[in-house]
Amino acid sequence: MTNFLSEDFLLMNEYDRELYYTFAKNMPICDYHCHLSPQEIWENKPFENMTKAWLGGDHYKWRAMRLNGVREEFITGGAPDKEKFLAWAKTVPKTIGNPLYHWTHMELKTYFHFHQPLDETNGENVWDACNRLLQQEAFTPRALIERSNVRAIGTTDDPTDSLLYHQKLQADDTFHVKVIPTFRPDGALKIEQDSFADWVAKLSDVTGESLDTLDAFLHALKERLTFFDEHGCRSSDHDMTEVPFVEVNEQEAQHIFRKRLANEGLTKVENEKYKTFLMTWLGKEYAARGWVMQWHIGVMRNNNSRMLHKLGPDTGFDSIGDGQIAHATAKLLDLLDKQGALPKTILYCVNPNANYILASMIGNFTESGVRGKVQFGSAWWFNDHIDGMRRQLTDLASVGLLSNFIGMLTDSRSFLSYPRHDYFRRILCQLIGSWIKEGQLPPDMERWGQIVQDICYNNVVDYFDMKETVRL
């Protein structure tokens, strides 16, 4: 029997272990997409307790607790923090087979040196012991980042953000991790949402411009793009339930924008035309700045309207959509490519049925001298588990070049989530090690080890052109 969460966790043979211990384990981390707060990094305040550090904002855990029948009072409600933690501890054993079970125990082991399964029998002891440790200097947000061997972090930021805390961090010589903003213009694109006019008004306030025409709106967005670029931004990020593509000209887009600001209803086709126009315009702007464009495709968000009204978005009521994406993705990428304005692009899909669609799509759009210009992104959200990661890796390898893959990201709001990179690295080494053991690859460990290191760190640093700003 293999011991639970041993040093050789997920490493099944000598090849897995050599790849992991010799090549993967000690590679730095570039967490190029996450939802950490730059303000919390800057302020670097100790966490009050484990609920604040571990459960706050974590809709993965909230969702599991709801599925286990925990009352909302003990999830997002007014129950004392200790009672919320104990409710989570009681839920943990029920998460077997879910990555939450592994993540929970990897995080406890990595940061708190706790090696036993967490459950209802020891939750109170774990609460007390971990809370004592959280008051130590080694458990502040910055210390946790540095202890995790992180070199760079890509946050997720609205175009109207002042980037005040990014500026403070960039000027702080005592913190050596690069905290880089990411331009996330969902508010500009989601013209169908009730909040669209308010977002345009906010952009108007930030830029000091009247945004009553599409030209003025684009000019304001361009100002913000330049502002983000001046503060180190290397990429954009887009949430897409479906990829938009309907042929459109500028005059149509201007008319649609005016209608929306006049509070006139838009058809679905008009919504898609506007999004197609703006995504094309943004893609050109990203390419001109040398940015990476990220698409997160296929999530059906806020499905429970009752809970959306009660708790707001991003609270655990999203799921996998089944929309058709192949045609629109190809058309939108091609529209940019034929104009010589396709930036480096990462395509993530939450629906694993689309894996081969995107893994094959990336080979359509290459550029002479550029390795892996368009990437099939890491297994995301509901795929962020052993089977999902293996499937993403093998699907990519089957129809593309796994060796050029830019690897793992946390997509997390927690400073304790970096063991997910170790989880990924073990799965990667297990996969390649199994190919060696089965005779599918020769035992050229230096060659495969270099590919492992590239996937863990080197490729993403090259891809985001960060060689001059991060250290090995």
Curated annotation (Swiss-Prot):
Q: Decide whether keyword ATP-binding is in the record.
A: no
EC code: 5.3.1.12
Write down the chemical reaction(s) this protein catalyses.
D-glucuronate = D-fructuronate; aldehydo-D-galacturonate = keto-D-tagaturonate
Q: Which UniProt keywords apply?
A: Isomerase
This protein's pathway: Carbohydrate metabolism; pentose and glucuronate interconversion
| Database matches in SUPFAM superfamilies | Metallo-dependent hydrolases
Q: Which GO terms describe its biological process?
A: D-galacturonate catabolic process; D-glucuronate catabolic process
What's one Pfam family here?
Answer: UxaC
Gene Ontology MF annotations: glucuronate isomerase activity
PANTHER family in the record: URONATE ISOMERASE
- Write out the similarity annotation: Belongs to the metallo-dependent hydrolases superfamily. Uronate isomerase family.
Q: What is this protein called?
A: Uronate isomerase
Species source reads Halalkalibacterium halodurans (strain ATCC BAA-125 / DSM 18197 / FERM 7344 / JCM 9153 / C-125) (Bacillus halodurans)
What gene makes this protein? uxaC
